[in-house]
């Protein structure tokens, strides 16, 4: 098992990519602390995972600094150390043309995607630098490499996450800590199913038309899967990933080429 005995803290971990990464880490022998806002859903996920005390839920809102920092502290305290941080919480907000985008919507995109990542990284580094060992994996987006109409705030936020990733990797590279970002393309998760219709409407098309448009932008002409994202996260967290840092890895079926 590639992650035997390792401890991971994962934000936004009860569904979609976050849950997929949690499942993959558990399968490789890690223990995981999961942060999410919905306690009822989180407890149901823990029961479904069925791994006993190797997985714990810690309530928190990624847009609240005290919650994010408290989550990192509690995860380390629960398991006695912290080896891996996965910043998965985030998402698209402010789905309007820029001329209609409010300051509040832009701020929300930054807080959910950028500040949540910043707060968690800063807190986790206190433990990781003391141990001279750690892996930070930020879940960004293909929109952190290019942009799309009405996704201006989200694209700006994910560009910021990628910039933070690259700079921090150089800052801590000689201290045993790697920092990377995974940039997924289209992945059909619950949040996409729930929020996608509004995005599609803002773009002047149906949800199915939007999904097909995004899929056709890729070389493989289909959405990526959660499992494909999780496999890259396992590599970055594993001993084999020790030489990878400062990378913004596209798992997008080739859409970042276009």
Regions of interest found by a model, annotated:
Residues 7, 14-16:
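Conserved glycine-rich cofactor-binding loop
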Residues 28-44:
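Conserved glycine-rich Rossmann-like NAD(P)H-binding loop of the short-chain dehydrogenase/reductase
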């Amino acid at each position: 098992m590639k992650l035997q005995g390792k401890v991971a803290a994962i934000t936004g971990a009860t569904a979609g990519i976050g849950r997929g990464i949690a499942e993959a880490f558990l399968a490789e022998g890690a223990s995981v602390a999961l942060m999410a806002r919905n306690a009822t859903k989180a407890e149901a996920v823990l029961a479904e995972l069925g791994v006993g005390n190797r997985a714990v839920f810690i309530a928190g809102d990624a847009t609240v600094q005290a919650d994010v920092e408290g989550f990192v502290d509690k995860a380390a305290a629960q398991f006695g150390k912290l080896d891996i941080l996965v910043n998965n919480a985030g998402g698209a907000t402010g789905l309007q043309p820029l001329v209609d985008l409010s300051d509040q919507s832009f701020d929300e995109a930054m807080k959910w995607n950028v500040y949540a990542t910043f707060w968690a990284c800063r807190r986790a580094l206190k433990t990781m630098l003391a141990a001279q060992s750690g892996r930070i994996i930020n879940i960004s987006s293909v929109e952190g490499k290019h942009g799309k109409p009405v996704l201006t705030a989200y694209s700006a936020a994910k560009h910021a996450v990628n910039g933070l990733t690259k700079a921090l990797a150089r800052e801590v590279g000689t201290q045993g800590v790697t920092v990377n970002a995974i940039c997924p393309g289209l992945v059909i998760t619950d949040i996409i199913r729930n929020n996608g219709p509004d995005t599609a409407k803002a773009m002047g098309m149906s949800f199915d038309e939007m999904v097909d448009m995004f899929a056709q932008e890729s070389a493989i002409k289909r959405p990526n899967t959660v499992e494909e994202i999780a496999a890259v996260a396992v590599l970055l967290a594993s001993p084999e990933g020790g030489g990878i840092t400062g990378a913004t890895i596209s798992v997008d079926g080739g859409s970042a080429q276009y």
